[in-house]
């Protein structure tokens, strides 16, 4: 009930403002305080916005195109091109996306070596239906550093459910970029 009352109060003030608001600054400060990887914050409407921006940032920063991923990552062409729902997506887009298996560090290392020097990022959910085993996340971080690849944790599902700092706070592995949505706003349209 407290959340709903706060939501109605904010709806009366406005929700999509063209200039930075005090509320955005306040939330940004809280996020950078509690989330280990958060040095800056960019707001969006949903998890797809957050993961799209993260991949674009990684590609710009590294000047590389390939994406290695595991887990679910919404509706971007790079992700959907590797699924059975790929109708309407140019086939060549799938040439830049490569799935590895969660908890299988060898499958990730094989892809990093196969596309050496061309991988922009590793996009992954830090935890999903199974917990990380055998220092999996620590080894992913090591390989990302070794290959100079941006590590992105998609915490759209996990963020703020496990900890105020996301699952990264619990596991002690800090990604280069993080994506949050859903739980951050109790299902309302917001992502960071």
What positions do the PLM features span?
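Catalytic P-loop NTPase motifs of RecA-like helicase/translocase cores
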Residues: 130, 159-160
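Glycine-rich phosphate-binding segment of PLP-dependent enzymes
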Residues: 1-43
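Active-site PLP attachment segment
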Residues: 171-192
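Conserved Walker B
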Residues: 127, 155-157
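Active-site nucleophile and cofactor-binding loops and adjacent substrate-binding regions
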Residues: 17-24, 42-48, 72, 157, ...
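Active-site core of PLP-dependent enzymes with the aminotransferase class I/II
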Residues: 124-150
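Buried hydrophobic positions in well-ordered alpha/beta secondary-structure cores of metabolic enzymes
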Residues: 7, 31, 54, 67, ...
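PLP-dependent aspartate aminotransferase-fold enzymes
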Residues: 26-120
């Amino acid at each position: 009930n407290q959340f709903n009352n706060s939501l109605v109060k904010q709806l009366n003030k406005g929700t999509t403002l063209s200039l930075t608001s005090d509320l955005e600054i306040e939330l940004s400060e809280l996020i950078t305080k509690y989330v280990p990887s958060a040095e800056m914050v960019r707001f969006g409407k949903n998890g797809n916005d957050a993961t799209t921006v993260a991949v674009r940032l990684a590609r710009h920063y590294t000047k590389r195109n390939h994406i290695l991923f595991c887990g679910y990552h919404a509706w971007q062409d790079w992700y959907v091109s590797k699924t059975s729902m790929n109708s309407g997506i140019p086939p060549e887009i799938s040439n830049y996306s490569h799935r590895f298996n969660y908890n299988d560090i060898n499958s990730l290392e094989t892809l990093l070596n196969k596309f050496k020097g061309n991988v922009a990022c590793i996009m992954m959910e830090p935890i999903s239906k199974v917990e990380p085993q055998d220092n999996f996340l620590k080894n992913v971080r090591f390989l990302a550093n070794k290959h100079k690849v941006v590590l992105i944790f998609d915490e759209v599902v996990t963020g703020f459910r496990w900890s105020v700092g996301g699952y990264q706070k619990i596991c002690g592995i800090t990604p280069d970029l993080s994506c949050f949505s859903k739980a951050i706003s109790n299902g309302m349209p917001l992502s960071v």
